[in-house]
A protein has these predicted regions:
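Hinge/lid segment of periplasmic solute-binding proteins
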Residues: 99-153, 207-210, 294-303, 384-388, ...
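Short, solvent-exposed loop/beta-turn-alpha elements that line the ligand-binding surface or hinge
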Residues: 115-129, 172, 200-201, 218-238, ...
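Glycine-centered hinge/linker elements that transmit conformational signals in sensory
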Residues: 182-187, 225-257, 298, 302
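Short, low-complexity disordered leader/linker segments with a strong preference
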Residues: 1-38, 61, 432-436, 440-450
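Conserved C-terminal helix/tail region of periplasmic/extracytoplasmic solute-binding proteins
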Residues: 66, 164, 378, 388-450
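C-terminal lobe and pocket-closing loops
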Residues: 119, 280-293, 306-415
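Extracytoplasmic "Venus flytrap"/periplasmic binding protein-like
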Residues: 58-129, 165-167, 266, 270-275, ...
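Extracytoplasmic/periplasmic solute-binding protein
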Residues: 140-149, 154, 177-229, 263-265, ...
Length: 450
């Protein structure tokens, strides 16, 4: 199959089996002012919960536009928004989407381009947006198809009190071998404390977000430059064996069902000594109203094995489906949600550590933010700047992406393999079998690109 046709057809693989047609927005002409209601679908992360709290008393009062939010867990969100956008359902006027989806959906004509509005509004200051984030949301035509709400890499978080109690010192650039040693010394199941929390929940963007960075730094890859699959290669296997073994020995309770949200709660409640995950978690951990470990957490670069850095690159961004009939109102919301003024609002109303950072250069010059985020801001920005979607490992890659492969089929492939790896964590299968099955699935994908 020609590559262009393969990509277009493979977009359908993002859909889950048995999806039904979505409803409509109720029609009506576009309206950017009072009396208008727009629908927003977003992932249930803390930053999105914050915007839900702030919208009515601020955005709606200023514009007269009401926003009806639907919040879903990450995996459910991905299924729901993919179904609606791909099927042209028109149920949502705006939605949070990630760096993986945006270039693919832009190619398929499913999203409005936002560069025109962003560049026309001088107060929005599009030039202030961090270049890695804008690049990850740009289509083949060079236009931006989603506006970054917050950006992130990944790093290692650790409980400083627990380390001090054991006389341990965390290096700024730890290796995975050091992390495993720390986990063994800090794990205390008798007191309900795990040595480390790592995602075990199936999902290409759940379990395989951290795991693929481990694969990269162990010298592995999903595909070589010529699309040769390497899912059961020694390096991929060694990384997965290490990850699964680390969780089984020293990980959190219920690890096969633990994703970002569950690990945030576990670590934030002081029930884990370390957590390797998104840099965006730091704001919540440093909020004393949301975390029991505020002021007790240290932040260091993503653990490595054979590479110098291994953090991922991701942004949750606001996109506007082509099917919306309320594009003007939708852009007003998107521009507000991703503006400097919104960051200031969050800082003043909810606390500066909760600002949705990682998207604007100016954020890191705000005195109040720098003070509240001093424990993690430098490592966060350094991690974002060192993330390399073009060359995240030890060999050339056929597609962009650090913790994912930037092709439509990866959502289905990554999720299927993650289900088997999660089962290995649960003890119902082996890593070798999981990756042998994954290799066969990857071979089927590779046929589209040979």
């Amino acid at each position: 199959m020609p590559k262009r046709l393969a990509i277009a057809a493979a977009g359908l693989l993002l859909l889950t089996a048995g999806c039904s047609g979505a409803g409509s927005t109720g029609g009506g002409s576009d309206d950017s002012g009072g009396g208008t209601t727009i629908t927003a679908l977003m992932v249930g992360n803390p930053q999105m919960e914050d915007i839900q709290k702030l919208t009515a008393d601020n955005f709606t009062k200023q514009t007269g536009i009401t926003v009806k939010f639907t919040i879903l867990p990450e995996n459910e969100l991905r299924d729901k928004v993919t179904q609606d956008v791909a099927n042209q359902g028109g149920q949502y006027d705006v939605a949070t989407v990630g760096a993986y989806e945006v270039p693919i959906w832009a190619k398929n004509g499913w999203l409005h381009e936002l560069s025109t509005q962003a560049q026309a509004d001088a107060s929005y200051d599009a030039g202030d947006l961090l270049k890695p984030m804008v690049q990850s949301l740009t289509g083949d035509d060079g236009k931006m198809y989603a506006a970054p709400f917050y950006g992130e890499s990944s790093f290692l978080m650790y409980n400083k009190e627990m380390f001090t109690a054991k006389g341990l010192t965390m290096p700024e650039h730890p290796t995975w071998a050091q992390v495993a040693d720390f986990a063994a010394k800090l794990d205390d199941k008798g007191k309900g404390v795990a040595g480390i929390c790592l995602r075990g929940l199936p999902g290409w963007g759940e379990l395989f977000a951290p795991l693929t960075t481990v694969v990269n730094t162990y010298g592995g890859t999903w595909f070589e430059k010529d699309w040769t699959p390497k899912v059961n290669a020694p390096e991929f296997t060694a990384a997965t064996d290490f990850y699964v073994d680390l969780i089984k020995k020293y990980g959190e309770k219920g690890a096969p069902q633990a994703g970002f949200t569950e690990c945030l709660n576990t670590f934030g409640q002081g029930k884990a000594a370390m957590w390797y995950d998104a840099t965006s978690a730091a704001g919540t951990l440093e909020d004393p109203n949301a975390s029991k470990v505020s002021g007790k957490v240290g932040y260091v670069y993503a653990p490595v094995n054979k590479t110098e850095y291994s953090g991922w690159l991701w942004t949750w961004a606001w996109a506007m489906p082509k099917t919306t009939k309320k594009a003007d109102a939708a852009w007003k919301f998107i521009s507000w949600a991703t503006s400097k003024d919104y960051e200031k609002l969050v800082g003043e109303k909810l606390g500066w550590s909760r600002v949705p950072s990682g998207k604007r250069t100016s954020t890191y010059s705000i005195a109040e933010y720098k003070d509240s985020a001093k424990a993690f801001a430098d490592v966060t920005l350094g991690s974002i700047e060192h993330a390399n979607p073009q060359n995240p490992g030890l060999q050339p890659r056929p597609a962009l992406g650090v913790q994912y492969v930037g092709i439509p089929e990866f959502a289905d492939l990554g999720t299927k393999v993650s289900q088997e790896v999660s089962a290995a964590i649960a003890g119902s299968t082996t890593v070798d079998k999981a990756l042998a099955d994954g290799q066969k699935q990857a071979e089927d994908v590779a046929k589209n690109y040979k």
